[in-house]
C-alpha cells in the first residue's frame, strides 16, 4: 500500500481528488478566465510569460492551467494520486503535449523533493 493510501486508511489524510474530479465536470470557460484574472490581480501583472510557476498541491489543476494560459512554464505537484490525475486530465484537454507544463507526484513536506525543484518565480499553494 502506498504512503498516500496508508495515510487515508489511518484517517491521517483526506482524499481531495474525488472532489476535484467532480469540480472538473462543471468547469466552464468562465471559471478558467476568472482564475486567470485572479492570478493577474494577485500578482499585479498582465501575463506570466517567461516566469516559472510552481503549483503546490495542484488539486484540480485550475490555477496551473491559468498560469499556463498566461504564458508561464508550469510545474504542478500533489501528494494525492487522484488530484494528479485531475491535473493531468486538465493539461491533456487544454495543452496536450506542450512541455511547458510538467506534473508530478510530490509532497511539500519532503525536503529532498523540494530541493530538486530548482529556481521558481511564482509559488502558488
Segment roles from a protein language model:
Residues 1-54, 60-118:
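Conserved N-terminal segment of class I S-adenosyl-L-methionine
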Residues 124:
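A conserved beta-strand element that flanks and buttresses the S-adenosyl-L-methionine
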Amino acid at each position: 500500500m502506498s504512503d498516500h493510501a496508508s495515510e487515508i486508511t489511518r484517517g491521517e489524510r483526506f482524499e481531495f481528488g474525488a472532489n476535484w474530479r467532480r469540480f472538473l465536470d462543471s468547469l466552464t470557460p468562465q471559471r478558467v478566465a476568472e482564475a486567470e484574472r485572479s492570478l493577474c490581480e494577485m500578482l499585479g501583472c498582465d501575463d506570466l510569460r517567461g516566469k516559472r510557476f510552481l503549483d503546490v498541491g495542484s488539486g484540480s489543476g485550475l490555477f496551473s492551467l491559468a498560469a499556463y494560459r498566461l504564458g508561464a512554464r508550469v510545474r504542478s505537484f500533489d501528494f494525492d494520486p487522484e488530484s494528479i490525475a485531475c491535473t493531468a486530465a486538465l493539461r491533456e484537454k487544454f495543452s496536450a503535449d506542450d512541455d511547458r507544463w510538467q506534473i508530478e507526484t510530490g509532497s511539500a513536506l519532503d525536503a529532498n523533493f523540494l530541493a530538486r525543484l530548482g529556481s521558481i518565480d511564482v509559488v502558488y499553494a
